[in-house]
Amino acid sequence: WVSTMPKIGILVFLLNLSFLATGYDIQWSTVVQDTIGNLYTPYAQPFQTLLLVCSVLSFVVGNIVGLSQYRIKRLLTFSTINHLGFMLLALAVSTEESVEGFVFYLVQYTLTNVNTFLTLLAFGYMTKGILQNKSNVREFVLLDDLKGQFYKNPLLVISFAVSLFSMAGIPPLMGFFAKQMVLYSVSYSYSYISIVAIITSVIGASYYLKIVQLMFFQKDSANTTIQTDSSEEVQQPLVTTMHSSVIAVLTLIISLYLFDSSILLNACHLLSLSLFSV
């Protein structure tokens, strides 16, 4: 949540700011509408251009630079930059369809991102377990630390792979439909940017597949046996029932979204319509 909630707050602020800049009558107070709205309306076109430029840069930087990363957190950071590109692209258009795509993308990104970090945290707990002395959690830092995890924690690896495939936009997972919704909403206005987004997403999918290849098809040659002194007591891994349940529920939502998508889609549609005044 520490890494996810600030991004959501900034994106929601940009959503409101994009409406003010483009002159849409959204549900703001009269004072705010008259002051901030009048301030940014003359800069509507430059603001939209800025969002489009930032979107394209996010696609290129997030996917191309991410290919050279070998640390897990840095790779996920550039992955986030790529996802922000899709949301900025939807904000730049500011139509009912694009806002609906923005809301849906934000929801699926939050679910997938939380599931990814919960799974990585569970990897650390499951690998080392709890010792009564210090440092009870092994932190996964490098991509090579994920080698052969399928042979140790198959269920966690499957959950992690589902999140990675969703972030890569592979059907029929939730991430695919989110990207499709955003690209469809902007395809008529900015088809060239849609092409850039598709090409860079295909390139960026390779580093997600690299992680899957490490977990499923390579064995860890390092000795991962926990060495303890006689005074140390190795207890059960610190993966609580709540932790496991949240991972299981999020994985099911991401993977089985296709079979019952009406609830989330209708909610996003109603929310986007509520932002526009008739």
Regions found by a protein language model. Give the residues of each.
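Alpha-helical transmembrane segments of multi-pass membrane proteins predominantly involved
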Residues: 1-278
